[in-house]
Amino acid sequence: MIINLQELIALLPFLILLLTVVIVILSISYNRNHFFIAFLTIISLIVSLCSLYFLIAIVPIDITSLFHITKRSILYISMIIISSIATCVFAYPWLLKYAFNKEEFYLLTLISTLGAIFLTISNHMASLFISVELMSLPIFGLIAYSNSQKYSLEASFKYLVLSGVSSSFLLLGISWIYAISGNLSLLCLNQIFSDLSNSEKMMVLFGIIMVLMSFFFKLSMVPFHLWTADIYQGTPASVLSFFSVSGKIAIFSILLYFFSYFSVFDNKVIFLILSLISFFSILFGNLMAIFQTNIKRFFGYSSISQIGYLLIILLVSKDEYFFSVQTGGIFLLNYLCTNIVYFGVINLFSNSCDYDIDSIHLYKGLFWVQPLLASIVTIVLLSLGGIPITLGFFGKFCIFSIIIKNHLWTIGASFLIGTILGLYGYLRLIVNMYLNPSEQSFINDIKKSNFWLCSPSGILIFISGIMLLILGIYPNPLINLINSVQ
Amino acid sequence: MLLSLLVIIPFLSGIFSFFSFRFQKNIPRWIALTGMGLTLLTVIRIWFFEDYYTYQIQSYTHLSYQLILPWISSFGIQFHIAVDGFSIVMLFLTLFLGIIAILCSWNEIKKNEGFFYLNIMLVLMGTIGVFIAFDLFLFFFFWEIILIPMYFLISLWNQKKEDKKKCINIANKFFIYTQISGLIMLASILLLVLNYYINNKILTFNYDLLLIQPVDKSIEYIIMLGFFLAFIIKMPIVPFHGWLADFHERSPYCGAVDIIGALLKTAPYGLLRYNKMLFPNATEQFAPIAIFLGFLSMFYGAWVAFSQVNIKRLIAYSSISHMGLMLIAIYGGNEISFQGLIIQILSNSISTSALFILSGQIYKYLKTQDISEMGGLWTNIYWIPGFSLFFALSNLGIPGTGNFIGEFLILFGIFKEHPLVSIISTIGIIFSSIYSLNMIQKIYYGLSKHDFPKFFLNIKEFWISIVLIFALIFLGLIPQKILNISFESIHFIYNFSKRIQ
């Protein structure tokens, strides 16, 4: 296996992160310094984000047979890295109060990021499997990081067991496919599938469905969603902004890669399964979100429905590659920004307490205490609901036009009902912030910490919120950017 | 550039009034009022000094006064606003009622003034936007944007402190209804645009372009139905009227209520501007059903209004009843009835808003909206009973007021096309006189149930009522002025919708 210079340049962002991982490990074993490690991690993530610039000229490129980088994956990689940066920025003030070892948090985040970005570019079953594992193993640690808290260990354990099961599904699926095709490359799948006899096709199909099931588990689609709310509840807010975004973007990008190239997926069975999953995810996620009183659980269910909307893209991605990539980009960016703000705000409030402030009634009357912050959260919730002047509206608009253009009427119906149910849920949170504050001490505590905007996390939250608004009013730059990466 | 001011001024004044709240509590309302005044001046400037008439060059509408900026080019969406006579009339109505709304809430809103005026200005901005948008996406954009501030207006500034929960529920109900209507409309707009795209390979949301290319016959009906549903939910017409009465009962009685006068009128505007123009064939086919729905809501509204014990619900149902007549005018009428429709829209908004304002005044003194607890108020209150009598009579269409002209022209127009429809509609109007008189009788005449203290009408409300009365009488005596403004557009709309078939 010979790697030439060009491929090395293509691997630059990954190598930077790998180097950082090594430095962090060495630094932890030699001398623990929280500030240094946090600073190093954030800087290296930023450097690796910038180094993506060098990739633009040389993609598309194959790095051995394991990885395949395209312009589109650069987009997704940058989103994942941004979410990691946000996590580290949010986690720093949280970790300052943390009693035990602080530095491993960054190590775990870095490794998981590495796994996620490898997943977006992997082109081989082996690299796919390893990346998935690399991505999810550190997350057990991250979820359990605040292990002194209620639900934390439970969530971590749940995710550990279920993730293990899903990995075994993935492995099983891969081996089914391998048994027939004799090749682990993703590209060969397409070629082989056309030459097979019917019974063999069934077996490959079974394998593919197994692989998809594992992915849908990771994306927490219905019917593999039962863990979502519990794990969201038990996870610290700063971890959630990473957990909820990076894994989902990575897996979605690999799914989009699958579904836009391979004729395998013209198959009726897969189409049916996909539409059913999307149908029920939209309805179920939105319906359950209405009844939640814990805003972390709320976002868990709401993310199910958001990814449900996203799955609609996959149904048509082969015929309308261009448009579906554009839609996916808009939607995922919206998801990223909303996540950063949503969990950033929870984290901001939780910093003054020992535990996460995650109950709805604690946020009652927030607007009258922190108007700017509450306005940003309002924008985020409206964006999730898809109301004009936010980016979410364009995501919704694009998906809706896909539905109508391709006459997916059943999904369209669930989209309509789901959006309305979802809006009901989001409005509940919004109006809660505008009611008169109750007499509890929490809101009065916030009054003291008026300078949230000056902290790094505050700036990040502010920028993301404003981005949603600006891109919602004038999305041209974003659309041009996404079009230019194709 | 002048046109964009129509949207920019309300928006900025809303923002400023929100932030100025910190300095002094009185500033927001002044800023809001100034903003409305400036917008009104802009409209007058456009009306006097620009040639805004719609005229026709080879079946292509050309609005000589328009502003087109590229917005989202990859989807063919433009920031395209334009004004024609019809829009001008609706803009005058919106701004007139907007100013009155602000004046009414002058002293009534005692908490969070800044946020309240921000919401009011945003609603007005959205309404203005709906009237001047000539890009379907932009139209939808404004159509949806109204909902959020409206939601806050209903849910946060209710009259009684104790039923906060109920208010939020009603706000949710309103939101869900309108959201359904919005999503259906989005679907229809997309269908229309994609249909155009398939035929011409141009992705555009431009109203003028979509207008000249007839829609495929096979899906024209479906798209038309989508638009129709979206509009009649907002209007509201009977099967979809569930939100209106609750909404009126709970909304803050001064500010928001008047806006409703303007807000509800976006739906007849849309029906005339979009349904009638874009889908002439399907509209023609659909007309009997629409007329039937119009009858339904006309009679149902009137009968239910008769049995209400809550003043505001009564007025809300009377408004539903009048909306039925408007729907019949749109679908059953000819050019004359369209012109009557415009007068009817104006005068009905004014008289309904006036009744709401007066009922708000009564509520302020008696702390109840229940008609059965009132009675014999004529001896206790100065001015209000007289004004109420005038507005109630005007509402049922007494000669000399705008409503009479409106109803007369509508019925006259319909009679030429479908005599029977016109005759049945006339019967509907009889019921409206019954419930109006019943309301007046129960509230103001007879013996007092309780021993109320005597009180005067607020001096501000007094002048507002006087202005409204003059407006109605103006409409009733010199409707030609209004008809002149809108004549060309209405003429064009009518001819265009007839010519194609």
Curated annotation (Swiss-Prot), chain A:
The alphabetical list of record keywords is:
Cell membrane, Membrane, NAD, Quinone, Translocase, Transmembrane, Transmembrane helix, Transport, Ubiquinone
The cross-references to HAMAP family, in alphabetical order and at most eight, read:
NDH1_NuoN_1
Report the record's Gene Ontology biological process terms.
ATP synthesis coupled electron transport
Catalytic activity from the UniProt record = a quinone + NADH + 5 H(+)(in) = a quinol + NAD(+) + 4 H(+)(out)
Q: Which organism is it from?
A: Buchnera aphidicola subsp. Schizaphis graminum (strain Sg)
Task: Extract one GO cellular component term from the record.
Answer: plasma membrane
EC number(s) stated in the UniProt entry for this protein: 7.1.1.-
Family according to the record? Belongs to the complex I subunit 2 family.
Its function, per the record, reads: NDH-1 shuttles electrons from NADH, via FMN and iron-sulfur (Fe-S) centers, to quinones in the respiratory chain. The immediate electron acceptor for the enzyme in this species is believed to be ubiquinone. Couples the redox reaction to proton translocation (for every two electrons transferred, four hydrogen ions are translocated across the cytoplasmic membrane), and thus conserves the redox energy in a proton gradient.
Taken from the UniProt record, the cysteine pairs bridged by disulfide bonds within this chain are none
Q: Does the keyword Cell membrane apply?
A: yes
Q: How does it sit in the membrane?
A: Multi-pass membrane protein
Name this protein carries in UniProt: NADH-quinone oxidoreductase subunit N
Q: Which gene encodes it?
A: nuoN
Assembly information from the UniProt record: NDH-1 is composed of 13 different subunits. Subunits NuoA, H, J, K, L, M, N constitute the membrane sector of the complex.
Pfam families per UniProt = Proton_antipo_M
Q: What transmembrane ranges does the database entry give?
A: 8-28, 36-56, 74-94, 104-124, 125-145, 160-180, 204-224, 239-259, 270-290, 298-318, 329-349, 374-394, 407-427, 459-479
Q: Where in the cell is it found?
A: Cell membrane
Q: Which GO terms describe its molecular function?
A: NADH dehydrogenase (ubiquinone) activity; NADH:ubiquinone reductase (non-electrogenic) activity; quinone binding
Enzyme class, spelled out: translocase
UniProtKB/Swiss-Prot annotation, chain B:
Listed under catalytic activity are: a quinone + NADH + 5 H(+)(in) = a quinol + NAD(+) + 4 H(+)(out)
Q: What is its main location?
A: membrane
Q: Does the keyword Magnesium apply?
A: no
Quaternary structure, per UniProt, is: Composed of 13 different subunits. Subunits NuoA, H, J, K, L, M, N constitute the membrane sector of the complex.
Alphabetized GO MF terms: NADH dehydrogenase (ubiquinone) activity; ubiquinone binding
EC number per UniProt: 7.1.1.-
**One CC-aspect GO term:** plasma membrane
Q: Which residues span the membrane?
A: 1-21, 30-50, 86-106, 115-134, 139-156, 174-194, 222-242, 252-272, 286-306, 314-331, 341-363, 374-394, 420-440, 459-479
Q: How does it sit in the membrane?
A: Multi-pass membrane protein
Name listed for the protein in its UniProt record? NADH-quinone oxidoreductase subunit M
The species this protein belongs to is: Buchnera aphidicola subsp. Schizaphis graminum (strain Sg)
- Family listed: Belongs to the complex I subunit 4 family.
Entry's Gene Ontology BP terms: ATP synthesis coupled electron transport; electron transport coupled proton transport
Q: Which domain of life is it from?
A: Bacteria
Q: Which InterPro entries would you find in this protein's record?
A: NADH_Q_OxRdtase_chainM/4, NADH_UbQ_OxRdtase, ND/Mrp_TM
What are the subcellular locations of this protein? Cell membrane
What is the role of this chain? NDH-1 shuttles electrons from NADH, via FMN and iron-sulfur (Fe-S) centers, to quinones in the respiratory chain. Couples the redox reaction to proton translocation (for every two electrons transferred, four hydrogen ions are translocated across the cytoplasmic membrane), and thus conserves the redox energy in a proton gradient.
Name of a matching Pfam family: Proton_antipo_M
Q: Which UniProt keywords apply?
A: Cell membrane, Membrane, NAD, Quinone, Translocase, Transmembrane, Transmembrane helix
